[in-house]
């Protein structure tokens, strides 16, 4: 189905075709959340505003269900925000038993995929080419950051339940290994030590 929206004033009506479908902040990996979840796109925007760059150490001592750290990892690995709904993984993420909303999957797609022009062969090919280019970029970044350690991304939270949620969300986001996260009070938390080359702590 194609979703149509109308904005009505006293003198005119404006018709919009919804080319997005489900809200774009819904990446498809977060089906568990804490009491005050941060929207995924807001977390990504804040990270960009701080000037953080992939490869730099990022430590979130109050990580909650992991929104900041997962968005950062996806940036580092060149994973497009809509990768899951675009069907760029072999299998969709499986929702947990604590899911608070249905997961966005490749079956949802984007709103524009239901518009008639998208069914033309040229548009279909352009869509395939875009996804293949994105996948190539993702593969290149996986070689650059082959493990969770190489990402230099870690976090902690005093709430054990949120730490568990973070681990589940990390896996559903198709990120490598298990996240570097532990249950710890933010006032006592310290980022993991990362000695320079040739230096070992004993």
Features from the language model and the residues they span:
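Conserved S-adenosyl-L-methionine
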Residues: 38-189
């Amino acid at each position: 189905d194609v979703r149509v929206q109308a904005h009505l004033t006293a003198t005119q009506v404006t018709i919009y075709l919804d080319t997005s479908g489900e809200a774009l902040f819904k990446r498809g990996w977060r089906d568990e959340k804490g009491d005050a979840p941060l929207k995924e796109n807001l977390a990504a925007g804040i990270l960009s505003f701080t000037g953080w760059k992939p490869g730099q150490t990022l430590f979130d001592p109050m990580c909650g269900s992991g929104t900041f750290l997962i968005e950062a990892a996806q940036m580092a690995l060149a994973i497009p925000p809509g990768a899951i709904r675009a069907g760029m993984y072999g299998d969709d993420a499986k929702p947990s038993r604590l899911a608070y909303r249905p997961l966005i999957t490749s079956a949802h797609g984007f709103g524009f995929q239901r518009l008639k022009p998208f069914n033309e062969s040229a548009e279909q090919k352009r869509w395939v080419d875009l996804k293949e280019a994105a996948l190539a970029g993702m593969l290149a970044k996986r070689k650059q950051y082959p493990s969770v350690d190489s990402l230099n991304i870690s976090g902690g939270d005093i709430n054990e339940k949120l730490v568990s949620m973070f681990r589940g969300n990390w896996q559903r986001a198709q990120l490598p290994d298990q996240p570097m996260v532990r249950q710890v009070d933010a006032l006592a938390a310290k980022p993991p030590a990362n000695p320079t080359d040739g230096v070992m702590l004993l």
